[in-house]
C-alpha cells in the first residue's frame, strides 16, 4: 500500500473555498464536498486534486488551495448538458497526465463530463462514481401526476428555449444515456439507498457497490425542533420550481387541509411566482410556474401560500425549525438532502413513498409515508401531525436518532477511505 493516495475528484460545481480564491460566485452548492475536501486536505495520507467546470473562463484554470490541494477548472465549448462535448475529454487527458492520480472519484452522473472523465482515465478498476440522483431513472418520473395539457403547453420562455415540461423530460433522458454508459464502464460505485442499488445493478450487474452517505451542511448538525416554538399549522417544502418536486400535489393536499385548518400556511423556498408583474419576469416564466400560480388562485390558496425567496443556509435552518411539518412531495428521490436536513433537526416529516425514501424513513416511526399520487393521504398525514403533538414530538425524536447514525461525519470519511484502500489493493 502506498504511503499517500493521489485521488482526483470530478465535481459538478466549484466548492466554496475554491470559488473564494478564484473570486467567482458559484451559488450555494457543494457544501458537503467543501467539508470533505477540508478533512482530506489536512490528512498526510491523501493528496487531493479537484476538477470542476469553470464557466467564468475560456482557459483551463489551475490553482492550489488549502494546505496542499490542487484545483483545475475546465472550460466548456458546449453548455447544454444534454449534448456531449468532445473537447472536455482532451482537457481531462491533460489534467490526468499532470496530476497522475491513483484513483478517480466522480461525484454525480447528471452531466456528460462524467462520461468524459471515465473515457479519459480509462481505468475501470481505479474509478469510482458517487451517484447522487440517477437521471436516467428520474427522467421516467419527470411528468408524474401532471395533466397532459400542462406537460405539452408552452410559456414564452419555454417556446424560445424549446424547453416545456415534455422537452425537459426528453433532455433528462438524453443526459441519462451518457450516465448509463459511464456506469457501465466503471467497476466501482458509491451508493446510499436500496433504490439506487437496484437501479445501478440494473444498469451494470457486475459493478461493485460501496456504501457511503453524504455529509449535510454544517449548521444542520446543531439545533433541535421544538413543538412549543414552531408556527402551528405551518408546512415547509424546500423546492417547488420544477415538476419532480411535486408542488402541484402539495397544493392539492393543501386544499383538503384548509377545510380543517383554515389558517394553514405553506412556506415554499424559492422565488415568489405570485408576484410576477414586470415584462421581464413574465417573459422569463416557465409554464410550470404559470400552472402552479393558476392552481393557487383557482383553489383560493393565495392567503395560505408564501414563497420565501432564496434562503441562505442559516435562514433555511430557521425555516425548518419554525415549521410544524416538513413535506417532501417528490415524484422520485434517491436520498433527499432536504429530508436529511429535516431529520437532523427533528422536524416531523411527511414524504412521498418513492425511490430511496424507505432507506431513510420507517413509516409511523421516524416519519410518515404516503402514496405519491394520493394527495388526500398527504393531507391526512399532515393533519395527523397538526392534531397530535405527542406523536409529532415522538417522530421528531426518532428522526434525530436515525439521522445522527446516517450522517455521522467520521463514519462517512472512514467509509470513503476504506473503499479507496480496497480499490488500490485490487
PLM segments and residue spans:
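Short alpha-helical donor nucleotide-sugar binding micro-motif in glycosyltransferases
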Residues: 96, 310, 318-323
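Nucleotide-activated donor-binding/catalytic signature segment of Leloir-type glycosyltransferases, i.e.
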Residues: 280-310
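Aromatic "clamp/platform" in nucleotide-sugar-dependent glycosyltransferases that forms part
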Residues: 331
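Membrane-proximal helix-turn-helix segments that form the acceptor-binding/catalytic region
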Residues: 151-188
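Short hydrophobic beta-strand element within catalytic cores of glycosyltransferases
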Residues: 348-351
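Conserved acidic donor-binding segment of nucleotide-sugar-dependent glycosyltransferases
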Residues: 363-364, 368-375, 384-389
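N-terminal subdomain of nucleotide-sugar transferases
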Residues: 1-58, 67-70
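Conserved donor-binding/catalytic core segment of Leloir-type glycosyltransferases
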Residues: 8, 226-245, 251-258, 266-267
Amino acid at each position: 500500500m502506498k504511503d499517500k493516495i493521489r485521488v482526483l475528484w470530478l465535481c459538478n460545481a466549484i466548492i466554496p473555498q475554491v470559488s473564494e480564491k478564484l473570486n467567482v460566485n458559484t451559488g450555494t452548492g457543494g457544501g458537503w464536498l467543501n467539508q470533505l475536501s477540508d478533512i482530506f486536505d489536512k490528512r498526510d495520507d491523501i493528496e487531493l486534486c479537484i476538477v470542476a467546470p469553470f464557466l467564468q473562463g475560456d482557459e483551463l484554470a489551475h490553482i492550489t488551495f488549502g494546505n496542499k490541494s490542487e484545483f483545475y477548472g475546465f472550460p466548456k465549448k458546449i453548455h447544454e448538458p444534454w449534448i456531449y462535448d468532445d473537447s472536455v475529454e482532451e482537457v481531462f487527458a491533460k489534467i490526468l497526465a499532470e496530476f497522475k492520480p491513483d484513483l478517480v472519484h466522480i461525484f454525480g452522473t447528471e452531466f456528460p463530463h462524467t462520461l468524459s472523465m471515465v473515457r479519459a482515465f480509462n481505468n475501470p478498476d481505479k474509478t469510482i462514481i458517487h451517484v447522487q440522483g440517477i437521471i436516467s431513472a428520474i427522467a421516467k418520473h419527470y411528468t408524474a401526476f401532471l395533466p397532459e395539457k400542462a406537460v405539452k403547453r408552452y410559456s414564452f420562455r419555454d417556446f424560445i428555449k424549446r424547453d416545456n415540461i415534455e422537452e425537459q423530460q426528453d433532455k433528462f433522458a438524453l443526459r441519462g444515456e451518457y450516465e448509463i454508459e459511464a456506469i457501465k464502464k466503471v467497476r466501482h460505485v458509491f451508493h446510499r439507498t436500496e433504490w439506487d442499488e437496484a437501479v445501478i445493478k440494473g444498469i451494470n450487474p457486475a459493478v461493485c457497490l460501496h456504501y457511503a452517505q453524504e455529509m449535510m451542511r454544517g449548521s444542520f448538525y446543531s439545533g433541535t425542533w421544538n413543538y412549543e416554538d414552531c408556527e402551528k399549522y405551518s408546512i415547509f417544502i424546500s423546492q417547488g420550481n420544477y415538476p419532480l418536486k411535486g408542488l402541484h400535489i402539495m397544493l392539492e393536499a393543501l386544499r383538503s387541509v384548509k377545510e380543517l385548518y383554515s389558517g394553514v400556511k405553506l412556506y415554499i423556498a424559492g422565488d415568489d411566482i405570485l408576484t410576477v408583474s414586470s415584462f421581464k419576469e413574465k417573459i422569463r416564466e416557465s409554464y410550470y410556474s404559470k400552472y402552479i400560480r393558476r392552481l393557487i388562485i383557482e383553489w383560493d390558496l393565495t392567503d395560505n401560500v408564501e414563497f420565501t425567496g432564496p434562503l441562505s443556509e442559516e435562514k433555511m435552518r430557521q425555516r425548518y425549525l419554525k415549521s410544524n411539518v416538513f413535506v417532501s412531495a417528490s415524484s422520485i428521490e434517491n436520498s433527499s438532502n432536504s429530508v436529511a436536513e429535516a431529520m437532523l433537526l427533528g422536524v416531523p416529516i411527511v414524504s412521498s413513498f418513492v425511490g430511496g425514501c424507505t432507506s431513510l424513513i420507517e413509516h409511523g416511526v421516524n416519519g410518515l409515508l404516503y402514496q405519491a399520487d394520493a394527495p388526500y393521504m398527504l393531507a391526512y398525514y399532515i393533519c395527523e401531525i397538526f392534531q397530535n403533538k405527542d406523536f409529532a414530538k415522538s417522530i421528531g425524536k426518532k428522526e434525530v436518532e436515525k439521522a445522527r447514525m446516517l450522517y455521522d461525519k467520521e463514519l462517512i470519511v472512514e467509509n470513503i477511505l476504506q473503499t479507496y484502500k480496497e480499490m488500490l489493493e485490487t
